[in-house]
Design a protein with these regions (language model features):
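Juxtamembrane intracellular "pre-TM" segments in multi-pass secondary transporters
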Residues: 4-18, 203-241
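Cytoplasmic helix-loop-helix junction between adjacent transmembrane helices
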Residues: 118-161
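Helix-loop junctions on the cytosolic side of multi-pass membrane transporters
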Residues: 194-215, 410-422
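Symmetry-related core transmembrane helices of the 12-TM Major Facilitator Superfamily/SLC fold
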Residues: 181-200, 395-411
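Hydrophobic core of transmembrane alpha-helices in multi-pass small-molecule transporters
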Residues: 29, 97, 110-128, 328-342
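C-terminal transmembrane bundle of multi-pass solute transporters/carriers
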Residues: 57-59, 69, 251, 260-425
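C-terminal ends and interior cores of transmembrane alpha-helices
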Residues: 88, 92-108, 311-324
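Helix-loop boundary and gating motifs at the non-cytosolic
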Residues: 14-69, 235-278
Length: 425
C-alpha cells in the first residue's frame, strides 16, 4: 500500500490537501475543547458525587469497558456507513451521555447508574476513535499529498493540545468559580455546535463506504478482513499487544494526577490546580506534536521512537511516585507527558502505513480496543492501590506496569516492516 515520507515537505501540501488538513484540525479543535472542559476535574466530580476512590476509578473502568465493547462495531459503522456518519453519531451520543452524567451528580446517584452512563460515554468516544484518523489519511491520499503523515498528525496533536490547554484550565477555573457541574454543561454545548460543523464541512473523500443489504454479513466480512490486516499482521499485532500497558496506564495516570497534585498542594478545594495537571499535559501535547516529525528524522526507524518513549516515560512515572514536593512533581509530570506525546504521532503513522484503506477505521478501532481493555483492568487495580497505599504508590506501580509494553514494541521492530522506515510512496 502507499506510504508517505518520513520527512516534511511543504510543497507536498497542495490546495486540496490543505483543505483536508483545515477540516481535520477544525474537528480536532472542537472535539478536544469539548472533552477537555472536564478532564481536569472529572475525578473530583466523581468523588464530590459521593463515590470512593475505588468507585470513581471503577466508573472510569466502565467507561473504558464501553470503549472495548463498542470499538469494533463502531469501526464497522465507519467503514460501512462512512466516517462522517460515525462522527455525527459520536457527537450526538456524547452530548446526551454527558448531560446524563451531570444529572447523576445532581441527585448523588448510586454507583450502578454511574456505571451505565459511563458505558454510554465510552460508546460516544468509539465513534470517533478510528473514524477521524481514517478519514484524514484517505482524504490526504486522495488529494495527492506526498508528505509525511507524522507532519499532519503532529499538527493535529498540537491543535488538540492547545484546545486541551484552554479547555482544562477554563474547566478548572469555572468549576472553582461556580461548581463542578458547569464544565459538563459547557461540554454539551460545544459538542452540539460540532455536530453542525461536521454536518457542513466533513464529507467522505477517497473512500466509498461498503454498505450492504445484509448488515450482519457485512460486519463479519469487514471484521474478518480487519483481523487479517490487524491481529494476523505481526508488526501490527505486537503494537496492539503493547497498548494495554501504555494506554491502560495512561488513562489511570491522567485522572489520578488530579487528586495527587491537590494532596501535594495541600488544598483539596483548589480545582484550578487540578486543571493545571491537564494543562501541563496539553502543553506537552502541543510541543510533542511539533517535535515528533523532527525527532523522527533523527532516527532510522519509527519503532526507535516508540521504544524510547515507552521506556523513559515509565521510569519517570516511578520517580513521580516517590516525589513529595509539589513543584518537582509538576516538572516530572511535564517531562513524562512530553516524552509520551512525542511518540503518539509516530505510532499513528506507523500503524496507518501498514493498514489497507478499506479496513482502516476498523483496524484503528481494534488498536484502540486493546488499549482500552488494559484500562478496564488497570484502573480499578490502581484505584484500589491508591485507596490502600496512596496515590504516590499507585503512580510508581503504573510505571512498572508500563514497562511491560517495551518487549512487544521491540518484537514489532524485529518484523522489519517497510512502514518502520517509510521514506517514500
Amino acid at each position: 500500500m502507499p506510504q508517505l515520507r518520513a520527512g516534511t515537505d511543504s510543497e507536498a501540501m497542495n490546495p486540496a490537501a490543505r483543505k483536508v488538513q483545515r477540516i481535520y484540525l477544525t474537528l480536532t479543535l472542537g472535539n478536544t475543547l469539548a472533552a477537555s472542559f472536564i478532564w481536569g476535574i472529572n475525578t473530583l466530580f466523581l468523588l464530590d458525587a459521593g463515590l470512593s476512590n475505588l468507585e470513581a476509578f471503577a466508573a472510569n473502568a466502565f467507561f473504558t469497558a464501553g470503549m472495548v465493547l463498542f470499538e469494533v462495531p463502531t469501526g464497522v459503522v465507519a467503514d460501512g456507513w462512512g466516517r462522517r456518519v460515525s462522527f455525527l453519531l459520536g457527537t450526538a451520543t456524547l452530548s446526551v451521555s454527558t448531560f446524563l452524567y451531570y444529572l447523576l451528580w445532581q441527585i448523588s446517584a448510586p454507583f450502578w447508574a454511574w456505571a451505565v452512563v459511563s458505558v454510554l460515554l465510552g460508546l460516544g468516544f468509539t465513534f470517533f476513535s478510528g473514524a477521524v484518523e481514517a478519514w484524514l489519511v484517505d482524504a490526504l491520499h486522495f488529494s495527492g499529498y506526498d508528505g509525511a503523515l507524522e507532519t499532519v498528525l503532529g499538527r493535529g496533536q498540537m491543535v488538540s493540545g492547545t484546545a486541551m490547554l484552554i479547555g482544562s484550565v477554563a474547566g478548572g477555573v469555572i468549576a472553582q468559580a461556580t461548581d463542578l457541574g458547569v464544565p459538563f454543561l459547557l461540554r454539551v454545548g460545544v459538542l452540539l455546535a460540532m455536530f453542525v460543523v461536521a454536518l457542513w464541512l466533513m464529507h467522505d473523500v477517497g473512500f466509498t463506504p461498503e454498505r450492504s443489504a445484509r448488515p450482519l454479513q457485512a460486519t463479519r466480512a469487514v471484521l474478518s478482513a480487519s483481523i487479517e490486516n490487524g491481529l494476523k499482521n505481526p508488526p501490527v499485532r505486537y503494537v496492539m499487544l503493547s497498548a494495554p500497558f501504555t494506554a491502560g496506564v495512561g488513562i489511570y495516570v491522567f485522572y489520578a494526577l488530579q487528586p495527587f497534585l491537590l494532596e501535594l498542594f495541600g488544598d483539596r478545594g483548589a480545582y484550578a490546580i487540578a486543571g493545571l495537571a491537564a494543562a501541563i499535559v496539553a502543553g506537552a501535547e502541543v510541543l510533542g506534536g511539533w517535535l515528533a516529525p523532527r525527532f523522527r528524522r533523527l532516527v532510522r526507524k519509527r519503532t526507535t521512537v516508540l521504544i524510547l518513549s515507552g521506556a523513559v516515560s515509565a521510569v519517570i512515572l516511578v520517580a513521580l511516585g516517590f516525589t513529595r514536593e509539589f513543584w518537582l512533581a509538576l516538572v516530572l509530570l511535564a517531562v513524562w507527558a512530553l516524552v509520551a506525546e512525542v511518540g503518539t504521532p509516530v505510532g499513528q503513522a506507523y500503524l496507518n502505513d501498514m493498514i489497507d484503506s478499506r479496513q482502516r477505521a476498523t483496524v484503528l478501532s481494534f488498536a484502540s480496543l486493546t488499549g482500552s481493555s488494559g484500562g478496564v483492568v488497570v484502573q480499578p487495580l490502581l484505584g484500589r492501590a491508591a485507596d490502600v497505599y496512596g496515590y504516590s504508590a499507585s503512580l510508581a506501580f503504573s510505571g512498572v506496569i508500563q514497562l511491560a509494553a517495551v518487549p512487544f514494541l521491540y518484537a514489532s521492530r524485529r518484523q522489519r516492516a517497510a512502514a518502520d522506515e517509510a521514506h517514500g510512496r
